[in-house]
Structure formats: structure tokens, C-alpha cells
Swiss-Prot record:
Subunit annotation: Heterodimer of an alpha subunit and a beta subunit. PSII is composed of 1 copy each of membrane proteins PsbA, PsbB, PsbC, PsbD, PsbE, PsbF, PsbH, PsbI, PsbJ, PsbK, PsbL, PsbM, PsbT, PsbX, PsbY, PsbZ, Psb30/Ycf12, at least 3 peripheral proteins of the oxygen-evolving complex and a large number of cofactors. It forms dimeric complexes.
Family membership noted in the UniProt record: Belongs to the PsbE/PsbF family.
GO molecular function: electron transfer activity; heme binding; iron ion binding
TM spans (from-to): 18-34
One of the protein's GO biological processes: photosynthetic electron transport chain
One cellular component (GO) term of this entry: photosystem II reaction center
Protein localization: Plastid, Chloroplast thylakoid membrane
Cofactor, free-text remark: With its partner (PsbE) binds heme. PSII binds additional chlorophylls, carotenoids and specific lipids.
Pfam families, alphabetized: Cytochrom_B559
Membrane topology per record: Single-pass membrane protein
Classification lineage: Eukaryota, Sar, Stramenopiles, Ochrophyta, Bacillariophyta
Superkingdom assignment: Eukaryota
Binding sites annotated in the UniProt record for heme: 22
Annotated protein name in UniProt: Cytochrome b559 subunit beta
Length: 43
């Protein structure tokens, strides 16, 4: 990534946005993966 001039130099990577994205994305992918798997595991 190019250096962002608008943001301070010591901009942390692990921010609330990072926690929100991963905190929601990981369970969502697991949930969608479970639903997708159930579509193929029919009796």
C-alpha cells in the first residue's frame, strides 16, 4: 500500500475496525459454510 498522508504515521493495524471485520467475517464464513454443506448432506 502507498503511504497514507492523511493518517498519522503510527497508525495501528489492530483497530476496532479490524476487530469488527474479523469478529463478524469469521463467524459469517463459518455459518455460510455450514449452510452450504447442509445443502449437500441430504438423506
Amino acid at each position: 500500500m502507498a503511504k497514507n498522508i492523511n493518517q498519522p504515521v503510527a497508525y495501528p493495524i489492530f483497530t476496532f475496525r479490524w476487530l469488527a471485520i474479523h469478529g463478524l467475517a469469521i463467524p459469517t464464513v463459518f455459518f455460510l459454510g455450514g449452510i452450504t454443506a447442509m445443502q449437500f448432506i441430504q438423506r
